[in-house]
Each structure stands twice: as structure tokens, then as C-alpha cells.
Amino acid sequence: MQEVQQWAASKGVIWLLVNSAGQHSGSYRDAATAKKEWDELKIKATAWIDDHDGKVGKLYGMRTTPHMFVIDQKGSLAYQGAIDDRPEPEGDPRKARNYVREAITKLMARGKIEVAETRSYGCGVKYSN
């Protein structure tokens, strides 16, 4: 995912990482912990949003982590779902069909996104309520 983040940033895309885990969840990160993990994992997102109350996640219907959302230049949802077509952890993710990269590429070319929604995969979001 970091390679896709870096690629997107090079195209001027704003990449927001939203942590909707409740404060009592093992997945919750405060700002200092998140920053440390960003550095260790070489995360290239534009910004991190602490959504511990889950308002943003619930607004978008976020079910898993990751659950990807691509918003177009007008602020409309253009794609949502999995980052790619490989839910299993084995294998090279660079060989997967990357739905997020495809959506961004099509939007930048003013084209039509072929796959606008897929089923996200990963661990369930642990909302506080």
C-alpha cells in the first residue's frame, strides 16, 4: 500500500488515513503512536485522522481495515472497497489488480472508472459503540 501511496502523492493526490478504531480497541492509535508507526512502516499518506468516535468511518460505511475510498475532484465518492483483488496475504501485491490505482488513473484522465465498488477485506473496524 505504501508504494501506491507514494505513487498517488507524486500525482498530487491527497491520501487520508482514517483510524476509526475506538479508544478501547487494540487497533486504536493516538497521534504520537501513529506518527511513530508511520515512520517505521514508511507510510506516505498526506494526513492521519483520529476518528476514535467512528463518525467518519460510519458516515462512509467503513467495514474493514483497510476499506478504501476514492473521492473525485468534485467531492463525490468515485470508488469504494478493497485496495486490490488479492485478499490473501501471500504473493506479491504488485501483481494484483489494484482498484485504487485504476480509479485514480481514470479520474486523472477524466475517464470512466470500470470498477466503482468491490467488497473490502481485512479485519473488521472496531468502533467504540
At which residue positions do the language-model features occur?
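Generic preference for well-ordered secondary structure
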Residues: A32, E40-L41, E88, L107
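Short, flexible active-site loop motifs that bind/organize anionic cofactors or intermediates
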Residues: H24, A47, E90
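Thiol-/selenol-based redox modules, centered on thioredoxin-like
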Residues: V70-N129
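Soluble non-cytosolic domains of exported or imported proteins
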Residues: Y28, A47, R94-N98
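Short, internal strand/loop/helix patches
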Residues: L16, K35-D72, L77-A78
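Sec/Tat-exported extracytoplasmic proteins
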Residues: Q5-A8, L41, Y60, M108-K112, ...
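Structural microenvironment flanking redox-active thiols in thiol-disulfide oxidoreductases
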Residues: M1-E40, H52-K58
